[in-house]
A protein has these predicted regions:
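Residue-level signal for short segments within beta-strands and strand-turn junctions
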Residues: 11-13, 21, 104-105
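Nudix hydrolase/Nudix homology domain
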Residues: 26-28, 92-160
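Residues within alpha-helical segments
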Residues: 10, 46, 50, 149-152
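Conserved Nudix-box catalytic region and its N-terminal flanking loop in Nudix hydrolases
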Residues: 16-67
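Histidine-centered active-site/metal-ligand motif
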Residues: 4, 22, 34, 94-96
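Generic hydrophobic secondary-structure packing signal
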Residues: 5, 41, 144-147
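Conserved N-terminal beta-strand and adjoining loop/helix that marks the start
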Residues: 1-17, 34-37
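Active-site segment of metal-dependent pyrophosphate-handling enzymes
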Residues: 54-107
Length: 160
């Protein structure tokens, strides 16, 4: 089975998460993408937010280790790691090993690209359907609902 490493970030601001309509997989998703050669998963998360959303973010982590050894650098762990089954017409069936992070904008006066929507906890809990570019309505998938709710709880006081 072919496997790719990916990173996804649930970006929280003012008690909402940012989602966009992903044309390829046809779902409302947070920013994310494949880990590039010589990139660690956090670098991927930061890059994808800049490329897809046009903003710089900070990664939230509950784990902070400090080492005095200059040969060691700590990379904070993700909130979770998902194995996601993917169907692709070019590659065929494969899996994504997806590092899931929570983050928030570095600059509270950021300008978000127009293809993004802000979704709050009520929207997630009630499985509200949002209009995509084809004027059809879809709710975010269950994993986005569950992880989005967790991100909103954990970052409640950091993103206002």
């Amino acid at each position: 089975m072919i496997r790719h490493f990916t990173s996804t970030v649930f970006v929280v601001f003012k008690n909402k998460i940012a989602l966009h309509w992903h044309e390829k997989v046809r779902m409302w998703l947070p920013p994310g993408g494949h880990v590039d050669l010589n990139e660690d998963p956090i670098q991927t998360a930061l890059r994808e937010c800049k490329e897809e959303m046009g903003i710089d973010i900070s990664i939230f982590s509950e784990h902070k280790y400090k080492f005095e050894d200059t040969n060691l650098q700590n990379i904070n762990p993700p909130q979770t790691i998902l194995i996601e089954k993917v169907e692709d017409n070019k590659i065929g069936p494969h899996e994504h090993i997806d590092f899931i992070y929570f983050g928030y904008p570095k600059d509270p006066n950021f300008k978000l690209l127009s293809n993004w929507i802000w979704v709050d906890s009520k929207d997630l809990m009630n499985e509200v359907k949002f209009k995509n570019p084809e004027l059809k309505y879809f709710a975010p998938p269950n994993d986005v609902k569950v992880l989005g709710m967790d991100a909103l709880v954990k970052l409640k006081n950091l993103s206002n």
